[in-house]
């Protein structure tokens, strides 16, 4: 019975292509998935089989494009906490694109437009999901397996001088950084995994939305979700792996399902066994 229901939900995921303008005036393909809207970026995703030799300078340039930044620098991991502390002391707020329980999409564009100095940490969700600097964030902090031991700090075009100076004080030249031999494959695999987890979360959210024991579901990709409009204009490539839900027998108590890149049917069946 459960297997049949899982198959029904999964098989109902039909992709219908279309296009829409993103928040920066670019185009995205919009896929309607049985009430769940999936945003697919037009940036070509690097795959595990598409591994090429790159320099650290090229890696940095890739993040400038992804985040919509004006420039980017490599900062040793050992200096990151000190850099963030300096920025916070100067009035910056460090946020993530997806945060809170129940999960919601941070309004980077709205908060930046209101004058808030934002540093967006995209190390968890992946820079490919959030064009943070294009949306107005002063900085975006990313991680990449090709440059282990460093973070990529992306700076908005016309970055506030003191913020740029704080970054430059901790940064090193990309020309002095050697790309890890296996880093390209690891990074490509991580991106594929994140996208697969996001796709799985779409199905899990749709499944939980019609579950007889579930009182409420929060997932940015559901049309009924409070963050849906913001998610479709500020995220690209998917809505992340987090699905929060509330059992009818435990009102007010949120639980989190974190999707993975494994087969979604198996994830749902395991969820039911544990639940």
Please describe what each predicted stretch is.
Residues 251-275:
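Structured C-terminal cap/extension of enzyme domains
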Residues 7-39:
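N-terminal intrinsically disordered, low-complexity tails
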Residues 202-256:
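Conserved small-domain helix->loop->beta segment predominantly found in fold-type I
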Residues 4, 13, 29, 56-70, ...:
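N-terminal glycine-rich, Lys/His-bearing helix-loop that initiates the first secondary-structure elements
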Residues 4, 8, 197-203, 267-270:
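Long, highly charged amphipathic alpha-helices
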Residues 36-57:
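Long, intrinsically disordered low-complexity tandem-repeat segments
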